[in-house]
């Protein structure tokens, strides 16, 4: 089976490629804009693909004819999407259309070719009035990012492909070169330095370990799943509770953590106050089994230590 991953230089993309290249019977094609930034270079094929370049998307998909595409690439900086709307549309809407169009055209030309598209989406498509949420909840986006991701979902759902949408929440983990921060590393670093941090207590999420999300996406492919699936962590936490758990794990001073309200933080884009997902469907249909948040912190900590010791 050939599985093509978009956004292979990103957090989820890296986890997907490394998991797929270790599995028998799977040929992984990693794609991203620019050069391959993964440290491990063997076990997969790398093909540059800028998803905003319609011609290149068509060429790469025609060349490889993947059995499944896991579309992990996106513009995910919520505030940047609010201020750079054209770039947001190019990445989160137009690129989805290019992938769908190319796969549909290839499917039409070859009746035996039935590719699957696994598309990543977000809890931010909801307005956050309540949670946790199941797959049947009605979207109501509050930001340009959220609107763009919902439009991407609509393109996938109206396609003639076999498709699955993996909605997820607040993904955390580390990339090869540890160049990207996340809420866990941010809290740890500031508390270790004795800095006071303001953390909102009125936003609730089900934080998702990147490895778990990668496993969920791969299960969607292996099970030939169709439809929308919530693929997130299982612990429903406020952001304040989340940061307290980080402090507990590392034995850091929780008195440095100051509760605050979302209204006190000035950001270009609105965030939904309460999301988080009910993941019963993924557990039942796919055998999805995510880590607890504390287990996720432990795994990340072990990964950081192994990189530092090399």
Which role fits each region the language model picked out?
Residues 48-91:
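NAD(P)H-binding glycine-rich loop region in Rossmannoid oxidoreductase-like domains
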